[in-house]
């Protein structure tokens, strides 16, 4: 075999002992086959990034679970602060290693404002060159599914048979996200993330104004992708 690129199917490639990370980079630098992996933002120590570049890393992908620190700690059990994420985004951007971001909207107990908080975090990340926006799906065996069932947001008999953009499965009372809100935010999230807080009111208006939405989306495409 003579692969041009290798994708490591590991949810958090750098969440392993430091010794293993450096041993991998030393070994891989002998071959320099471009590679791509998923990992967590707060695992990207500057020394890791330098070693990965030397080893021939092609790109990285990160999941941004939520930009709302309280929600992330209480519901998602992620203890890193927003400031820590921003610190590590700076390290990642300074490394010049290309990266993309994955976002999931519509999680249990999530509100519209929490989604906007996530968009604002993505906006501050700055250096990403790709953004995938998915819808929460309550897969069997996950804590978030159990949480949704216990809260009465989901029938325990529900089985997801589609992908991450299948129909939204949970039904939450206000003030949590409603289905029509989620549909609008899935459509406009990239705009909120790209243009930032100063454009929030205009983007919110575009959620119900298709002409304005198309104008903003065309501007976003030009600024983000350039002439393609």
Task: Explain the meaning of each model-derived region.
Residues 3:
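Oxyanion-binding "anion nests"
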Residues 9-12:
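Glycine-rich Rossmann NAD(P)(H)-binding loop
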Residues 18, 22-211:
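A structural motif corresponding to the C-terminal lobe/cap of the Radical SAM core domain
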Residues 206-228:
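C-terminal non-catalytic accessory extensions
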